[in-house]
Amino acid sequence: MSGHSKWATIKRKKDAIDSKRGAIFTRVGKEITVAAKMGGGDPEGNPRLRLAILKAKSVNMPKDNIERAIKKGTGELEGVVYEECLYECFGPAGIAIMVSAVTDKKSRTTPEIKSILTKLGGSLATSGSVSRLFEKKGVIVLESSQIGEDKLVDLAVGEGAEDVINEGEVYRVITTPDDYESVLHALNEKGLKSEESEIRYIALISSEIADKEVAKKVMKLIEQLDGHDDVTSVTSNFELAASLEKEFE
């Protein structure tokens, strides 16, 4: 599970600069619309929609926005037709990157993702060549000021979490996809608020970067991919070498 603290930092900085919460709501809204289109508008009978709604609530998305996104998916409201895309990529120094996107026009999104990769030393990979290096996990990020580590471990692991990682300012709770919902619910019941929560790809093996210039390029690539309007998540197996950590604080 190592190598993700720097990515968490990048993401928090991006979300702060991004402070257009509307951009976050748009991303989550697309996920809700796709989930409702695929499995119907009733979250009780549509686990994927239920999880998308949980994610929306974790970023304080207004109830009206959630309901509109559902209705667009079910056809009750007119809206754009979205489809999911998963891009398997290689970055500088051969790092592996998984990019998830939701788009209304794949023929536009794919060349744009490819262009970002090409400009920063990356490339699209063949199907299966990168995804085999990752697995899907539930990831719940909490500010550490809310609860002590021992208490969180007892609570989260007691509900089925696999791991709790202390990253200083935040804790990262890792679950299986099946246990994600129950763990998140248990944390919410205790009044704990998550900075982010989702089921996403996690690297099985990390790739350490010790060269400062390569590290800069990798981080810029990840930020630009994550900044694309259609991208919903970016995960890489990039890990910053200990010798460079102070350089990027």
Swiss-Prot record:
GO terms for biological process: regulation of DNA-templated transcription. Coiled coil: none annotated. Pfam families: TACO1_YebC_N (PF20772), Transcrip_reg (PF01709). InterPro entries: Integrase-like_N, TACO1_YebC-like_2nd/3rd_dom, TACO1_YebC_N, Transcrip_reg_TACO1-like, Transcrip_reg_TACO1-like_dom3, YebC-like. One of its GO terms (molecular function) is DNA binding. It is found in: Cytoplasm. One of its GO terms (cellular component) is cytosol. Keywords: Cytoplasm, DNA-binding, Transcription, Transcription regulation. Belongs to the TACO1 family. This is Probable transcriptional regulatory protein LBL_2537.
